Amino acid sequence: MFRDRTNLFLSYRRTFPHNITFSSGKAPLGDDQDIEMGTYPMMNMSHDISARLTDERKNKHENHSDALPPIFIDIAQDVDDYLLEVRRLSEQLAKVYRKNSLPGFEDKSHDEALIEDLSFKVIQMLQKCYAVMKRLKTIYNSQFVDGKQLSREELIILDNLQKIYAEKIQTESNKFRVLQNNYLKFLNKDDLKPIRNKASAENTLLLDDEEEEAAREKREGLDIEDYSKRTLQRQQQLHDTSAEAYLRERDEEITQLARGVLEVSTIFREMQDLVVDQGTIVDRIDYNLENTVVELKSADKELNKATHYQKRTQKCKVILLLTLCVIALFFFVMLKPHGGGSGGRNNGSNKYNNDDNKTVNNSHDDGSNTHINDEESNLPSIVEVTESENDALDDLL
């Protein structure tokens, strides 16, 4: 029968790479399957694709087995199941609350028993959640799970899980508490209504029964002995009934007391979580204060260094200013023109020239005397320059 393989071929062509080089068929084909694969390249291609997909599945399975999540992830998932059950029970409890709050004359004892049962189950689920959180906290403190030490990344994940699930548990617990408070407010509205005393009602009924029985006995003319026996039997039955009712009431009170103790333990656990959260906040505040002290000390050191550098900068500026003043005064003194000194130098030079002219005609002794006279004439100008320099230095100081 003819089969259309066009769609299969197109799908293979779209998914398979186009740079595949097929064999030329020189290799010997041993069996019919090899002949078919050599004759039809797409069959060979499909075989390669299936082999490749099989290898990829094996690799994925191996990688998945190597990269399994930590065990505490499975432990924490139990909290999700418990919280889901708490939500379901809370919804049922809210429906029963609404039904019981409607006015009516039917007997609501069944609804009250159902309310107590659902409340007890919700508290049990919350207790299980707290037990799981306590186990996660123990794992986080010991940093070991099933003999294996947790890494830093796993500890961070575990810490985040604790915070997330603690918030979820607290949210569900608050919802349950709000439901109970609303129902208690509804019940407290009937506190001021007159309540009929059960004992008085029973006594009244008993008196009526006794009167009717006495009248009946009188009418029938029964003996006093039979009447006394029946009265004793009736009293014994009433005593047994009252004892059973008393025991039943005591049993209900004990059950309510146990549930109240369970609720109190739940409240204390919530208070423990609040204390732990407050301790964490206080630790963070203490850590931030310590960091602030360290940073303030480093800032104080930097300010002291800056003050020291500022003082040194001022000293350097003063020294530089004085140096510039000295240099300016030095150049001023060197470049200042002196009238008396220059005239003395000119006279001395003229005399020296005249003496040189005379040395041509006179002897060597006369020339030496003239030179001595020239030096003596230059002394006043040198003294004047020295006095001017001293005056400038005095002005600077």
UniProtKB/Swiss-Prot annotation:
Modified residues (Phosphoserine): S109
GO biological process: cytoplasm to vacuole targeting by the Cvt pathway; endocytosis; Golgi to vacuole transport; inositol phosphoceramide metabolic process; intracellular protein transport; mannosyl-inositol phosphorylceramide metabolic process; protein exit from endoplasmic reticulum; protein secretion
Membrane topology, as annotated: Single-pass type IV membrane protein
Pfam families: SNARE
Membrane-crossing residue ranges in chain numbering: 318-338
Subcellular localization: Golgi apparatus, trans-Golgi network membrane; Endosome membrane
GO terms, molecular function: SNAP receptor activity; SNARE binding
UniProt biased composition (Basic and acidic residues): 353-374
CDD domains per the UniProt record, alphabetical: SNARE_syntaxin16 (cd15845)
UniProt main location, coarse: Golgi
A cellular component annotation (GO) from this entry: SNARE complex
Domain t-SNARE coiled-coil homology: 244-306
Summary of the function given for this chain in its UniProt record: t-SNARE that functions in transport from the endosome to the late Golgi and on the endocytic pathway.
Subunit structure, interactors included: Interacts with VPS45.
Homology family: Belongs to the syntaxin family.
Alphabetized PANTHER family for the sequence: SYNTAXIN, SYNTAXIN-16
Protein name: t-SNARE affecting a late Golgi compartment protein 2
